[in-house]
Amino acid sequence: WLSGKEGHVWRLRDGQLVEVARLAVSIEGERGIHSIAIDPQFTENRHVWIYYTTASPQVRNRLARFRSVGDQLVDETLILETPDLLGEFHHGGCIRFAPDGTIFLSTGDDLQNSSTSQNPDDIRGKMLHINRDGSPAAGNPYLAGGGDPRVWAIGLRNPWRFSLQPESE
């Protein structure tokens, strides 16, 4: 699987790249497709997850789940969306699955300095930890209040990539 900033999503089939989707995205600055992740249970559910910037009139970053059918991505399901974007830079954006099947998603601060990243009620400039339906994952620090319950860490400027360390002794 491969994605391009301009909205293209390809799959390698029989040694050839086959376009399976072309999303309507905003590509100004650092906008576009930010991350793609193949579901760990892909052989059973055929799910592909994409974090991207939507096109006008409401330009937002969106995490969506698609289903792979043949050589197409279909059935887009909205999982979460940021507020309207003000800047063209600092959108971050990386999707990783935890061993328990939950999702970690990094989001940039939309070049709004600390007004978004330090605000625990705003999902921009954060590390989010969610269930597959977009609900907050167990153990998040704001589950009892004081911020958006999907937030796992605050104060991130432009976290465009990260890794999860496998369990070790």
Name these PLM-found stretches.
Residues L111-Q112, L143-V151:
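Short, well-ordered junction/capping motifs at the entry into regular secondary structure
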Residues R96-F104, R124, H129-A138:
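A structural motif
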Residues G29-E30, G87-E88, G145, W152-L156:
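Conserved loop/turn at the beginning of each blade in beta-propeller domains
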Residues W1-S114, R161-E169:
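Acidic, Gly/Ser/Thr-rich repeat motifs that build Ca2+-stabilized beta-propeller blades
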Residues R13, V69-L73, D133-G145:
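Blade/loop signatures of beta-propeller domains
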Residues G147-E169:
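Repeat-solenoid scaffold signature
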Residues R62-D71, Q118-D133:
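Beta-propeller blade signature
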